[in-house]
Amino acid sequence: VQSGTGEGTLAELSDGRVYYNSRCHMAVDGKRLISWSHDGGHRWVDWQACETLREVGEPFYFKYGTKPSYGCNAGLVRLPLETTNGKDVLLFSTPDNPGGTRICMTVWASFDGARTWPVKRLVYPGPSAYSSLAADTLGNIYLTYERGLSANIKCDIDHHKISLATFNLDWVLSGS
């Protein structure tokens, strides 16, 4: 795995490839790093910055000054093939805020092996951070995420509880 990445998420596609999407520590451009493996995770190729799924988080302050955003952990799941007519459908979750702070927990959908993420749906508009996704063979999707109390909180680490959102792919597809 490439240096400077961490808290990566993985999904195996139906053709055997493994997709890797990672938080990029100290990312200057605010982009997550992605890669694919064709051999079960032994070697990773096509390292690149993801243009759609961007990092969030305020600049990291330390005793010598300010560093770029430290990013945020995210969730990733491939939906069971029996719920998607045999097609790879990936879902990705993380806060989505162009302003940088950790708010607006959002789920994105990909239908082409994580090359593009054309659909996204807001789950929670307030403070939110780390998330995890799971799906069952009945079509239920489960999102756990850190959640704050107020969208007006300036401190992006004020996440008071873990929340569970349950939905299905149709709900995601009704997003933008």
Residue ranges of predicted features:
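Asp-box/BNR beta-propeller blade signature and adjacent active/binding-site loops
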Residues: 1-176
